[in-house]
């Protein structure tokens, strides 16, 4: 057997009175540490809630004592999009010079945490297709929102997300491949939507709770030749 050291989180932050700059590897911006499923299982609501971490640079600006705006650029590493024909592990990230761009507005008070965010990702699955040079990209947008209310008796959380090619967030979906007349494969993302609700007691010793999650794969345009995604029929998903 072989033992390996696995780096999950390693960051540094430069702080000023109203501005902070963080760089390193930490949670995806869509995984909100204050608002994630409080299930007993270690999977933290995977498939309904984003999961994973990536190398990133984040700039956070305080607009008021409770309201902040974060701008983030990150690159997938350990968690990645699906591999197209001719691709190797994480080649879609390596081939793309543009990082994933993310913006998030968050309100945080003593009892309420709420936020809205958006993300744009442009990946290049391969640099060669059908023996020809390829610069075809799979472009996608994503939008999400969340809310948490907590007092001395109750904790209530809600989260919703919708967008294309959410495979790297350990959710269903990915992208489809389309054959062009010249043989080069082009790509379009598949759309995934998910939401969840988590209600639990705030008791310090025994805290019963209930979690409900729903996710839907809305597919993509017709005429595709190949599917590169999680959540389709097969021996492995």
Where in this protein do the model-derived segments appear?
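C-terminal/domain-terminus segments
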Residues: 2, 76-91, 95-96, 212-234
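Active-site-proximal beta-alpha loop/turn segments in soluble metabolic enzymes
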Residues: 40-41, 76-90, 122-132
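Detector for outer-membrane/organellar transmembrane beta-barrel domains
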Residues: 108-236
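Alpha-helix capping and helix-loop boundary segments enriched in small/acidic/polar residues
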Residues: 47, 89-93, 135
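Outer membrane beta-barrel
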Residues: 1-79, 97-98, 102-113, 149-159
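Transmembrane beta-barrel architecture of outer-membrane proteins
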Residues: 5-9, 52-54, 98-102, 138-142, ...
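A short, polar/proline- and glycine-enriched secondary-structure boundary/capping micro-motif
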Residues: 32-35, 81-82, 126-127, 169
């Amino acid at each position: 057997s072989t033992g390996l050291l696995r780096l999950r989180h390693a960051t540094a932050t430069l702080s000023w009175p109203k501005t902070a700059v963080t760089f390193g590897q930490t949670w995806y911006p869509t995984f909100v540490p204050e608002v994630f499923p409080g299930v007993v299982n270690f999977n933290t609501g995977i498939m309904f809630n984003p999961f994973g971490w990536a190398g990133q640079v984040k700039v956070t600006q305080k607009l008021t004592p409770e309201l902040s705006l974060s701008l983030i650029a990150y690159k997938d590493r350990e968690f990645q999009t699906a591999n197209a024909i001719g691709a190797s592990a994480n080649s879609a990230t390596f081939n793309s010079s543009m990082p994933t761009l993310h913006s998030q507005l968050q309100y945080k008070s003593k009892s309420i945490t709420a936020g809205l965010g958006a993300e744009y990702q442009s990946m290049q699955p391969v640099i060669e297709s059908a023996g020809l040079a390829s610069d075809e990209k799979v472009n996608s947008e994503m939008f999400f929102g969340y809310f948490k209310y907590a007092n001395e008796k109750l904790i209530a959380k809600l989260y919703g997300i919708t967008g294309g090619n959410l495979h790297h967030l350990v959710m269903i979906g990915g992208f489809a491949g389309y054959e062009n007349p010249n043989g080069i494969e082009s790509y379009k993302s598949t759309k995934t939507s998910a939401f969840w609700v988590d209600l639990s007691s705030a008791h310090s010793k025994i805290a019963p709770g209930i979690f409900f999650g729903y996710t839907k794969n809305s597919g993509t345009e017709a005429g595709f030749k190949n599917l590169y995604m999680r959540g389709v029929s097969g021996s492995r998903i």
